[in-house]
């Protein structure tokens, strides 16, 4: 079960960063370790004005962010995470003038790294726009502050 404090702040975390707020990221829901987010279609997010298809960079940003949120859900707390590796396979263009959705699930959590799979889609996960696999570095300082894990440092 997800910690009620985390559940309360997840919607704000979906769009707390300047870029996620500007792009309109929204939390759709959490089920188990799976997180779903949405970016409502807007003309200013289009990558190709002739087709109305959303920009590829938007897809990447959404997959990265929903992946990080899946890590928080798996850890059942908010903590600093940093993307170590993000591989995105684009399978098709997003449908013109449709919202973009993404789901992510943290499938392995170690002391220092979390591993995530994610999908971006416009209608169903069975027909993804893109799929991603990512690794995120976890804040492993145990609350001791920056540099606490450096060899020879005293906390």
How does the language model describe each region?
Residues 10-32:
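N-terminal structural module
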Residues 1-4, 94-97, 101, 105-155:
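HotDog/MaoC-like acyl-thioester-processing domains
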Residues 24-54:
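Catalytic strand-loop segment that frames the active site of acyl-thioester-processing enzymes
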Residues 7-17, 69-78:
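Short, solvent-exposed helix-to-loop capping segments enriched in aromatics
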Residues 54-77:
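Active-site helix/loop of acyl-thioester processing domains in fatty-acid/polyketide metabolism
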Residues 70-101, 106:
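Hydrophobic beta-strand-centered segment that forms part of the acyl-chain substrate-binding groove
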Residues 21-23, 33-35, 80-86, 98, ...:
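A generic structural signal for short beta-strands and their flanking turns/coil linkers
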């Amino acid at each position: 079960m997800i910690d009620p404090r985390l559940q309360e702040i997840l919607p704000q975390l979906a769009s707390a960063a300047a870029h996620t707020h500007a792009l309109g990221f929204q939390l759709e829901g959490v089920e188990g370790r799976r997180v779903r987010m949405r970016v409502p279609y807007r003309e200013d997010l289009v990558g190709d004005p002739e087709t109305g298809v959303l920009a590829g960079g938007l897809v990447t940003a959404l997959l990265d962010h929903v992946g990080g949120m899946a890590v928080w859900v798996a850890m059942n707390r908010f903590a600093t995470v940093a993307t170590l590796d993000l591989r995105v396979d684009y399978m098709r263009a997003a449908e013109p003038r449709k919202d973009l959705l993404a789901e992510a699930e943290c499938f392995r959590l170690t002391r220092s790294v979390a591993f995530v799979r994610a999908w971006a889609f416009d209608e169903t996960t069975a027909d993804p726009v893109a799929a991603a696999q990512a690794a995120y570095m976890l804040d492993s300082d145990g609350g001791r502050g920056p540099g606490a894990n450096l060899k020879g440092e005293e906390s």
